[in-house]
Amino acid sequence: MKVLVLGASGHIGARLLEMLQATPWAAATGASRRMKNTASWLELDSRDPRQLAQALKGFDAVVNCVAGDAASIADGARALVQAALQVDCPRIVHLSTMSVYGPAEGNVREDAPLDPTLGWYGQAKCEAEAAMHDFVRHGGEALMLRPGCVYGPGSQLWVGRIGRWLQAGRLGDLGIAGDGWANLVHVDDVCQALLLALRLPAAQGKIPVFNLAAPDSPRWNDYFVDLALAIQATPVRRLGSRRLQLDAWLCGPPLKAAERALKLLGSAGIKLPDALPPGLLGLWSQHIHLDTQAASHRLGVQWTPYADGLRDSAAWFTAPAGAGQATLDKMICTP
């Protein structure tokens, strides 16, 4: 099977490409805006249907791991569908997110209604899913995965910046503000699910959808304390809601503005504190628990135990070239 991985320079895409290239059944090629010096790599703008159509010729499937801003996610998905239909690329495996469920709480299955009201990220992901439905209506095959918070080695979002906030005393035991379910899923488990989805039979006109989160994933407070102990960011502080609100709403916007300005200036090596996005305050207290029975039973995902994922994450964070120091090239402009 010839497989093209879009967004292959990102956290999940890069690991997926490694795992695909180790299989006996896949011939994998990576693609992103940043070219790598390898024969199995394409440089392209995933928002350009013409570039995508040229790149997709001859591929049996494409995995969409594109991240970034709203245009990259939503417009990129629409461009991908247009290109795949044009050149008869038969299958898209699309990486979505649990953010499409909005502020839902309780045990959430894949048939729960989508809600794009949490912000630009959830809105863009909902639009991308709509594009996949359009692809299927026109005769294509699509499968969608909705992971929770992807941690493990290489995760700047859910290990790197969390660890740095813990080291700085800006995060710890949040009390009721951190009592939501973390819905953590190891990056290798996401990639395992993508590999399985590439070969899963799909009924015509239907899109199989799978939530991804480890069944033993803890609540956010437990994860913060566990990670702090594992990286020796102790003592773990007990933080009140007022302190978090001030950090997110007063300090967050200017830090984010400075980060974006310095990136535009090409000053990627400058160290800045990580901005605390206000949206995370809602996530950490949201009692949403992804139901992953379909991924366990239909896909056959074998989940990484939380203790092993925590150990892997801490080892990566504390390694000499790990994530313990924040520089602009490590920062990711997503929620």
Name each model feature, range by range:
Residues V3-A22:
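N-terminal Rossmann NAD(P)H-binding glycine-rich loop of SDR-like oxidoreductase domains
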Residues L42-D60:
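Conserved Rossmann-fold cofactor-binding substructure of NAD(P)-dependent oxidoreductases
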Residues V62-L95:
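NAD(P)-cofactor binding segment of oxidoreductase domains
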Residues E105-Y151, D173-G175:
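Catalytic helix-loop patch of NAD(P)-dependent Rossmann-fold dehydrogenases
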Residues E127, Q156-R161, A177-R199, I207-N211:
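Substrate-positioning beta->alpha
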Residues H138-M144, G148-A182, V187, L227:
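NAD(P)-dependent short-chain dehydrogenase/reductase
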Residues L200-A275, T292, C333-T334:
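Mid/C-terminal beta-alpha module of Rossmann-like enzyme folds, strongest
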Residues S285, L290-H297, T304-P335:
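Amphipathic terminal alpha-helices
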